Amino acid sequence: MAQVPAGKNRSGQLSKQTGDAWENQARRWLEGQGLRFIAANARERGGEIDLIMRDGTVTVFIEVRYRRSARYGDAAASVTPQKQQRLLKAARLWLCRQNGSFETVDCRFDVVAFTGNDIQWLKNAFGE
């Protein structure tokens, strides 16, 4: 694991590194399922989309979640309605920058959840 410079937010840095590692694992796993990578960590006003991929002709916005155990609920349960709204807003803005919209682009919202060693792929987990 990379060294975190002194004086930096060590907890935040480690969380970012952990998140990046799980997002990379999700990307590789989804590519193995036939999806094609478009973008990672797409930041838009009000939110960030972990992965954007294509499944055939469908643009897929993917939220990646990890929990060490299901003690407080599995990873998928951590995608709250508020988080869903932020993702919808970010996706709408991202599509707009690509000259698209929910009306013109076939898209869906998936969640890839890692709980311990288990992976769960929730296709069409939520929508607008």
Curated annotation (Swiss-Prot):
Family matches, as Pfam families: UPF0102 (PF02021)
Signal sequence residues: none
MF term (GO), any: nucleic acid binding
Lineage: superkingdom: Bacteria
Disordered: annotated span: 1-20
Family: Belongs to the UPF0102 family.
Protein name: UPF0102 protein KPN78578_35270
Organism of derivation: Klebsiella pneumoniae subsp. pneumoniae (strain ATCC 700721 / MGH 78578)
Higher taxonomy: Bacteria, Pseudomonadati, Pseudomonadota, Gammaproteobacteria, Enterobacterales
